[in-house]
């Protein structure tokens, strides 16, 4: 079952990316280093739930 998630910047708290993930196979929270346009650098982005 795919669920919609957002990736929130840990520095500026903006939700910069949205994607889907398989909730059955990936139970842990997703953490990725992605580019933050507000900070203009690569920062850690953590998974949050989006309203679907």
From Swiss-Prot:
Single biological process term from Gene Ontology: translation
Signal peptide stretch: none
One MF annotation (Gene Ontology) recorded for this entry: structural constituent of ribosome
Coiled-coil ranges from the UniProt annotation: none
Disulfide bonds: none
Keyword tags: Ribonucleoprotein, Ribosomal protein
PROSITE patterns noted in UniProt: RIBOSOMAL_L33 (PS00582)
Gene3D superfamilies given in the database record: Ribosomal protein L33 (2.20.28.120)
GO cellular component, one term: ribonucleoprotein complex
Pfam families linked: Ribosomal_L33 (PF00471)
InterPro entries: Ribosomal_bL33, Ribosomal_bL33_CS, Ribosomal_bL33_sf, Ribosomal_zn-bd
SUPFAM superfamilies (alphabetical): Zn-binding ribosomal proteins
Family: Belongs to the bacterial ribosomal protein bL33 family.
Name used for this protein in its record: Large ribosomal subunit protein bL33
